[in-house]
From Swiss-Prot:
The keyword Ribonucleoprotein does not apply. Testis. Residues 1-30 are annotated as: Disordered. Pfam families: Protamine_P1. This is Sperm protamine P1. It comes from Homo sapiens (Human). Belongs to the protamine P1 family. GO terms for molecular function: DNA binding. Protamines substitute for histones in the chromatin of sperm during the haploid phase of spermatogenesis. They compact sperm DNA into a highly condensed, stable and inactive complex. Residues 14-30 have a biased composition (Basic residues). Phosphorylated by SRPK1. Signal peptide: none annotated.
Amino acid sequence: MARYRCCRSQSRSRYYRQRQRSRRRRRRSCQTRRRAMRCCRPRYRPRCRRH
């Protein structure tokens, strides 16, 4: 439970940020996704092509 706790918080913040900053949606989503993925499972690293 503790492991997914951080992931959930990150996902929530990501949704709120997406609604607020819809213009920088791709750039923000990339960084937030990387952070959430690192928190949940540090072994998996998603590739961010559009930075």
